[in-house]
From Swiss-Prot:
Cofactors, names only: Mg(2+); Mn(2+)
Organism: Maize streak virus genotype A (isolate Nigeria) (MSV)
Gene Ontology terms, MF aspect: ATP binding; DNA binding; endodeoxyribonuclease activity, producing 5'-phosphomonoesters; helicase activity; metal ion binding; nucleotidyltransferase activity; structural molecule activity
Region described as Oligomerization: spans on this chain: 175-187
The protein, known as: Replication-associated protein
One Gene Ontology biological process: DNA replication
Annotated EC: 2.7.7.-, 3.1.21.-
Homology family: Belongs to the geminiviridae Rep protein family.
Record-listed a divalent metal cation binding positions: 52, 60, 62, 104
Length: 360
């Protein structure tokens, strides 16, 4: 089942990291060594730790970390040391962060060689003379190293390379999506768990077991599910509550496709506007798609079922040719809803309310 967490997943990506451990009395040297070991895979170059005192006398710890490769983490507890949890930030101006840390320390420890922040894309530090204009490669290298989000990355390019930004925006958006992939918010069912109130629940259960809940041989081919019926009957909520999935509504966007998803959902998209419908319905493997603002790519390394949801006025089968309909019926379980059916069970009334309802 999908996670119940409604918070967006934590993400940090930067070669310069600023850590603050509130109410932490750790020795700066010990803290430095522990943090250094945590980031070995990203090739640490420099770390500075300083212990300071709050006005109330309690101690806290600041740390500036610089690595050759950007630190990429999605666990907010990654930098925890001895039970102390830090505030994790990207150090956009390492010179200022270092000056701030060294302002009033009680104890300090450094390891490695500090890498001063260069003046904006000049290839020279603030104290050095500006001798020559940087190349585009140098500018982009600096942007990639210091940008902390997709929006900041594109904004920095627009500022430093305005002509390239205006003529090659599609390619910069593609690289931005690669550097800062979108973290999809996990679906949370807004309603209490319940079973579908259907006339033929058995056919749905027979489809769920082999296609969603049971692992199968990688060589086997899954089967999709097509549900057509009225709005406000819980189709989308039921489909989205089954597990990790790719969800498309209004249009199919391949740019954020998740290979780890168990299944796909096509929700309220007219048949004529669904690209690769045969590949999705047929649970095919390794087919080519063309993401918006990106290059063509191969997706779906293993057979993956698709749940197609449609209202009666957008019934896919009414738009298909005889040949298309034959393919659809061969690769898809079709469930046409009857009047009164819902994909959730009505809440049970308390005994007193139930008696009153019967009398009325």
């Amino acid at each position: 089942m999908a996670s119940s967490s409604s918070n967006r997943q934590f993400s940090h990506r930067n070669a310069n990291t600023f850590l603050t451990y509130p109410k932490c009395p750790e020795n700066p040297e010990i803290a430095c060594q522990m943090i250094w070991e945590l980031v070995v895979r990203w090739i640490p170059k420099y770390i500075l730790c300083a212990r300071e005192a709050h006005k109330d006398g309690s101690l806290h710890l600041h740390a500036l970390l610089q690595t050759e490769k950007p630190v990429r983490i999605s666990d907010s507890r990654f930098f925890d040391i001895n039970g102390f949890h830090p505030n994790i930030q990207s150090a956009k101006s390492v010179n200022r962060v270092r000056d701030y840390i060294l302002k009033e320390p009680l104890a300090v420890f450094e390891r490695g060689t500090f890498i001063p922040r260069k003046s904006p894309f000049l290839g020279k530090s603030d104290s050095e003379v500006k001798e020559k204009k940087p190349s585009k490669d140098e500018i982009m290298r600096d942007i990639i190293s210091h940008a902390t989000s997709k929006e900041e990355y594109l904004s920095m390019i627009q500022k430093e390379l305005p002509f390239d930004w205006s003529t090659k925006l599609q390619y910069f958006e593609y690289s931005a999506n690669k550097l800062f992939p979108e973290i999809q918010e996990e679906f949370t069912n807004p309603h209490p768990p319940s079973s579908p109130d259907l006339l033929c629940n058995e056919s749905i259960n027979d489809w769920l077991q082999p296609n969603i809940f049971q692992s199968s041989d990688e060589r086997s081919r899954k089967q999709s599910l097509y549900i057509v019926g009225p709005t406000r009957t819980g189709k989308s909520t039921w489909a989205r509550s089954l597990g990790v999935h790719n969800y498309w509504q209004n249009n199919v966007d391949w740019s954020s496709y998740n290979e780890d998803a168990i299944y796909n959902i096509v929700d309220d998209i007219p048949f004529k506007f669904c690209p690769c419908w045969k590949q999705l319905v047929g649970c095919q493997r390794d087919f080519i798609v063309n993401p918006k603002y990106g290059k063509k790519k191969k997706v779906q390394k293993k057979s993956k079922p698709t749940i197609i949801l449609a209202n009666s006025d957008e019934d896919w089968m009414k738009e298909m040719t005889p040949g298309q309909l034959e393919y659809f019926e061969a690769n898809c379980i079709i469930y046409i809803m009857s009047p009164g059916e819902k994909w959730y069970s009505p809440p049970e009334l308390p005994p007193t309310e139930a008696v009153h309802s019967d009398r009325s």
